[in-house]
């Protein structure tokens, strides 16, 4: 019997073809079409507190946020929009519920876009004509943001609960009202707390229209739970080519939402990777404290912008192989660490010097990469 070893003949399945969608401008950020998938977040400050809101927007911008949303539940908040929109370094979307008058206030204030919730704005259907005319005159797109928790009562009566079909019908109905007034500068979201329902709703929507889609799992929960839900839902849809902009909803500081959203895009190859740390989960073979080592290396390299892969490995099983695959890596054991740079062992250091040596080598490689402008194959750091 002949046994042939080698790679499987079937190629890896690529991500799905990007869904065709019309393109809109949210300020200076393109959404839809062939534009990169953008990352959004939402301020947790009182919008009426202009300074606090602008300070949080600055933090979000520094973390990589491209579009920010602010809540407008009161007249004081509406009055603050002009100053915020004027001074914000990234496009500002006004989030409107209940009162249609705030939609007009947001447009007049110079917001880059307005999100409306058709499920709870008073007499919304009757106001669509006025909203469409005002938004069209100002060049302001409208996001029709359908949420499971505030679905129109007529649809709840029809479907019994917030099903994928109910969410989709709500969005398409409101789109049709805007279309009657020749307004199509629209993007849509159909959010649900259950990732499975959310995925099904967006699939239906993607087949039914060509508007750009804003992905989100509403009320996703605390940081860990919300990260898992969003990663599952966004990963499934983006892998199918569905989704043009994302917002990870977490019961956590908004900057954390941006970090998670960016990481999801990077993991799918939809955003150029920066620093990536790969580490093993540890086991009885590990001869170093992998957790501490990985955390120390990660902290020491935080903020690095170049696409560097660093591998921190704790034993001799996968350690040397993983380290060789990375730009920089360490394979640890017997109180020592072998330092690999682009596949070659360059030195062996005592365990106490591993972190310091890795950081020094990473900084040196980063300077080289920045100088010659040639990124590595993939930015990542591996710890195993």
Swiss-Prot record:
Q: What keywords are assigned to this protein? A: 4Fe-4S, Iron, Iron-sulfur, Isoprene biosynthesis, Metal-binding, Oxidoreductase
Any one GO MF annotation of this record: 4-hydroxy-3-methylbut-2-enyl-diphosphate synthase activity (flavodoxin)
Q: Which cofactor does it need?
A: [4Fe-4S] cluster
* Catalysed conversion reaction: (2E)-4-hydroxy-3-methylbut-2-enyl diphosphate + oxidized [flavodoxin] + H2O + 2 H(+) = 2-C-methyl-D-erythritol 2,4-cyclic diphosphate + reduced [flavodoxin]
Q: Please list the residues that bind [4Fe-4S] cluster.
A: 280, 283, 315, 322
Q: How is the cofactor bound?
A: Binds 1 [4Fe-4S] cluster.
Record keyword Nucleotide-binding present: no
Do you know which InterPro entries this protein is assigned to?
Dihydropteroate_synth-like_sf, IspG_bac, IspG_bac-typ, NO2/SO3_Rdtase_4Fe4S_sf
Q: In which pathway does it act?
A: Isoprenoid biosynthesis; isopentenyl diphosphate biosynthesis via DXP pathway; isopentenyl diphosphate from 1-deoxy-D-xylulose 5-phosphate: step 5/6
Going by the record, the broad EC class of this enzyme is: oxidoreductase
- KW Iron-sulfur (keyword) present: yes
Instruction: Cite the Pfam families for this sequence.
Output: GcpE
User: What is one process in the GO biological process aspect for this record?
Assistant: isopentenyl diphosphate biosynthetic process, methylerythritol 4-phosphate pathway
| EC numbers | 1.17.7.3
Q: Which family does it belong to?
A: Belongs to the IspG family.
Q: What is the stated purpose of this protein?
A: Converts 2C-methyl-D-erythritol 2,4-cyclodiphosphate (ME-2,4cPP) into 1-hydroxy-2-methyl-2-(E)-butenyl 4-diphosphate.
NCBIfam families per record = ispG_gcpE (TIGR00612), PRK00366.1 (NF001540)
- Protein name, entry field: 4-hydroxy-3-methylbut-2-en-1-yl diphosphate synthase (flavodoxin)
